[in-house]
């Protein structure tokens, strides 16, 4: 199959048996069969059409900041959008390709004195991933500013969905159900004062640095916020701050985070998540729901 891929997808940057731990914020994860870095939409379509024709599974990953890849890796293609990263400004509108870095996009907004993107100034990830999960923080979220997104449907068609059609919810969108790929997104911002925007971004960045364990690899916020509660507080109340399985620990700095402190594995993450859910449910009666996505095969399927 590798020779066929080299022949039929000639010119596309494809890496074979590539360890995904090098690409994830958790620094865990096994190898993927075929890791593709398309440069444009045409190359994405070529990869997807080839995969469908050959019966090879495929999926898209952004910056992998809120994802855990299992230790057995991923079969088939993983498409990384890193090379589709242009950001353009027209009036009060920013249009960004799916692979554009979210934090860097907020800096573009700041440069043009456009307000509305400040909430995302410290959120790691890509534009595509941010749209996919309706990323948010400090009272703001993608749904508040997104006008539309261009997507590639599973059938191979390029379509534009407006804000309403994307059916945003708390850390969710229709994209989590329909299997479409985000190609680009358009955001409507408002004119603002450069200094005021800069000060707000600095304030939010400072808050993030104070409260979050940025010094360790992690998958970001592990659980969604339960209605009327904070996941981190529930975990702390259950006595789990600092609890460790293998090389992964419930952060001492913020119990809503799990950090890879010493050569942790995806299995360590999964086991710790399951343990936290069980203990919190027993102590509070509240069942925590994962925000982080877990994908791939467990190690015992290798």
Curated annotation (Swiss-Prot):
EC number: 1.3.1.98
Pathway(s) the chain acts in: Cell wall biogenesis; peptidoglycan biosynthesis
Cofactors: FAD
Species per Swiss-Prot/TrEMBL record: Streptococcus suis (strain 05ZYH33)
Record gene name: murB
InterPro entries associated with the record: FAD-bd_PCMH (IPR016166), FAD-bd_PCMH-like_sf (IPR036318), FAD-bd_PCMH_sub1 (IPR016167), FAD-bd_PCMH_sub2 (IPR016169), MurB (IPR003170), MurB_C (IPR011601), MurB_C_sf (IPR036635), Oxid_FAD_bind_N (IPR006094)
GO biological process, one term: peptidoglycan biosynthetic process
Residues covered by the FAD-binding PCMH-type domain: 27-192
Family, similarity comment: Belongs to the MurB family.
Pfam families, alphabetized: FAD_binding_4 (PF01565), MurB_C (PF02873)
Entry function: Cell wall formation.
Catalytic reactions on record: UDP-N-acetyl-alpha-D-muramate + NADP(+) = UDP-N-acetyl-3-O-(1-carboxyvinyl)-alpha-D-glucosamine + NADPH + H(+)
Protein name in UniProt: UDP-N-acetylenolpyruvoylglucosamine reductase
GO cellular component: cytosol
Compartment list: Cytoplasm
Record-level Gene Ontology MF annotations: FAD binding; UDP-N-acetylmuramate dehydrogenase activity
Active site feature: 171, 221 (proton donor), 291
Keywords: Cell cycle, Cell division, Cell shape, Cell wall biogenesis/degradation, Cytoplasm, FAD, Flavoprotein, NADP, Oxidoreductase, Peptidoglycan synthesis
